[in-house]
Design a protein with these regions (language model features):
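N-terminal secretory signal peptides
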Residues: 1-19
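Ferredoxin-like iron-sulfur electron-transfer modules
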Residues: 12, 48-68, 101-130, 134-161, ...
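N-terminal export leaders
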Residues: 13, 19-40
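Twin-arginine (Tat) signal peptide motif
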Residues: 16-25, 72, 128, 159, ...
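A generic secondary-structure signal for well-formed alpha-helical elements
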Residues: 32-39, 73, 79-84, 136, ...
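Signal peptide processing junction and immediate N-terminal pro/mature segment
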Residues: 42-47
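Carboxylate/His-rich catalytic cores and anion/metal-binding grooves
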Residues: 73-102, 157-163
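Long, compositionally biased charged/polar accessory segments in the mid-to-C-terminal portions
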Residues: 210-290
Length: 290
């Protein structure tokens, strides 16, 4: 019954967007050519202004403090039951947060490496949301998070193509849950509050929404607001960062750590010219690097 309801919801979403089967197939054929013609900036900048959300959860990453240990990547995989790719599967790997090593300068032992840690940007104006034909990708109206309804995803990968940050990954294989695959999983005891993802759908970073849900429920039960210090370690990548490079909080709270850091002269965002307004903000020492 549940599966039938999910199918009906997906069909309703298609009809709401006036997508017949024929039109949908034509759109599938055209999307690659359209995006190859450099339409991503147009998609991003043409979006209407969104209503302000109650919270604007964001992450600040200090590049000067990131040591490239990738503890963030490993802890994220454990928390969200993301399988580890073998050397043969690297092209089809799934990384909810990835660390890019961009360039290396100098010689050992005086080596300077530019590192770019990159989770989902949870954009204010996410192009992935507008290109999804079935409403599987959506923006949380209260928190501004860009999330995924896995049961609706049809695997068209429009969102993957539209994302200018490469933050979305297609699930090429069955998930590592139970049975014979149990011993192969990085985390043999999967997190019960993290939704399962199935073969043929897209997944990505959620800013650890399952942990945020628990904190919000606790604060509501106690009849109080969420404190900034409680938010800081909500994301598992923040909690396990050895260099203390990551910070998480609410940009709508002007006194929060992330708000103060975002207003500093060291702050910048990736591809700001696209108008996506990402909620991952980077800090760098401009005088030390080209």
């Amino acid at each position: 019954m549940e599966e039938k309801n999910q199918i009906e919801e997906t069909i309703a979403a298609l009809e709401k967007k006036n997508l017949s089967r024929g039109h949908f197939l034509k759109l599938t054929a055209a999307v690659g050519a359209a995006l190859a013609a450099s339409n991503i900036p147009k998609i991003a900048t043409a979006m209407p202004a969104k209503n302000k959300t109650k919270h604007r959860y964001a992450m600040v990453i200090d590049l000067a403090r990131c040591i490239g240990c990738e503890a963030c990547t490993v802890s994220c995989k454990v928390e969200h039951n993301v399988p580890v790719a073998s050397p043969k599967e690297l092209a089809r790997r799934i990384e909810w947060t990835e660390v890019y090593f961009l360039k290396e300068k100098g010689a050992y032992p005086f080596v300077n490496i530019d590192i770019d840690p990159r989770p989902c940007m949870h954009c204010e104006h996410p192009p992935c949301v507008d290109v999804c034909p079935v409403g599987a990708t959506y923006q949380d109206k209260d928190r501004g998070l860009v999330l995924q309804r896995y049961e609706r995803c049809i695997g068209c990968r429009y969102c993957t193509t539209a994302c200018p940050y490469g933050a979305r990954y297609f699930n090429w294989s069955k998930p590592y849950y139970g049975g014979k695959l149990r011993e192969e999983a990085l985390n043999p005891d999967p997190h019960p509050q993290v939704k399962k993802r199935y073969k043929g759908i897209v997944e990505k970073c959620t800013f650890c929404v399952e942990r945020l849900d628990r904190l919000e429920a606790k604060a509501e039960k106690e009849g109080r607001a969420i404190r900034d210090d409680e938010l800081h370690n909500i994301c598992t990548c923040v909690k396990t960062c050895m260099g203390r490079a990551r910070h998480f909080g609410d940009l709508n709270d002007l006194n929060s750590t992330v708000s103060k850091l975002a207003r500093s002269g060291r702050a910048f965002r990736l591809l700001e010219e696209l108008g996506t307004e990402p909620k991952v903000i980077y800090l760098r020492d401009w005088g030390n690097k080209a």
